[in-house]
A protein has these predicted regions:
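Core SAM-dependent methyltransferase catalytic element
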Residues: 180-183, 190-215
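Class I SAM-dependent methyltransferase Rossmann-like catalytic core
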Residues: 1-51
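A short SAM/SAH-binding and catalytic strip from SAM-dependent methyltransferases
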Residues: 113-128
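A short glycine-rich, Lys/Arg-flanked "PGG" loop and its adjoining helix->strand segment in the class I
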Residues: 128-143
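Class I SAM-dependent methyltransferase SAM/SAH-binding core
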Residues: 35-36, 40-106
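Short alpha-helix
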Residues: 40, 163-187
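Conserved class I S-adenosyl-L-methionine
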Residues: 143-174
Length: 215
């Protein structure tokens, strides 16, 4: 499969076809991975995200798993529920947007130093479009860290995510990033399956130093 045209039309459909705004209207003040997996996400962010950087937490929630002792210049949040984002103490500001309808991010080109998508990539119906926008707003050479587990809301996760085994989700996300123009793509297993913690995987992609390579 060289591009998304090789996938059936239903690959990015969902069982629940009602507007996403209805599903996310009521805030869920819960975490979707356990404390060990959360700690692994935090350690990854500590390693990868620059001090005093502008961080974009895409598809965020009432908590961001950024390390509390690291100074960032700004943390921009995005999500679908205003109450949850307003409750997140890590966010400097946030915006509401349904990326499945409009993947265009309301941010300046080359204005972000690093981006995170935590346990949410499975809900994107236009993953390559969203990631292309991330490549636009990220500075040359900067990165996005995408983390995911084996959990999801099954009525809202896209069909291809649910059809692909857990062991192949990394390959799928790497493919998304490749199609969106990212380079130096790296897959990591942060919490191996079969242990007492929730499994957790990460895929990291970097924007080429030449923005034209993302076009």
């Amino acid at each position: 499969m060289r591009d998304l045209s090789g996938l059936p039309a239903a690959a990015f459909g969902k069982y629940d076809t009602a507007p996403d705004e209805l599903f996310y209207a009521e805030p869920r003040f819960v975490t979707h991975i356990d404390a060990y997996a959360i700690a692994a996400v935090t350690a990854l962010y500590r390693e990868l995200f620059p001090l005093e950087g502008v961080i974009l937490d895409l598809m965020s929630s009432w908590v961001s798993h950024l390390p509390g002792d690291v100074p960032y210049r700004e943390v921009i949040g995005h999500g679908m529920n205003e109450r949850k984002l307003a409750a997140n103490p890590k966010l400097s500001r946030f915006f509401l947007q349904n990326l499945n309808i409009d993947p265009m991010l309301p941010l300046e080109t080359s204005s972000v130093d690093a981006a995170a998508i935590c346990v949410s990539v499975q809900y994107l119906q236009k993953p390559v479009g969203v990631l292309r926008e991330l490549a636009r707003v990220l500075k040359p050479g900067s990165l996005v860290a995408i983390t995911f587990s084996n959990r999801c809301f099954p009525t809202k996760a896209v069909m291809i995510w649910q059809a692909v085994p857990d062991v192949d989700h990394q390959r799928l996300v790497m493919f998304y990033l490749e199609q969106a123009g990212f380079g130096s793509i790296e897959a990591r297993t942060l919490c191996p399956p079969g242990h007492s913690t929730d499994p957790l995987w990460a895929v990291i992609g970097r924007v080429p130093n030449s923005k034209s390579a993302c076009a």
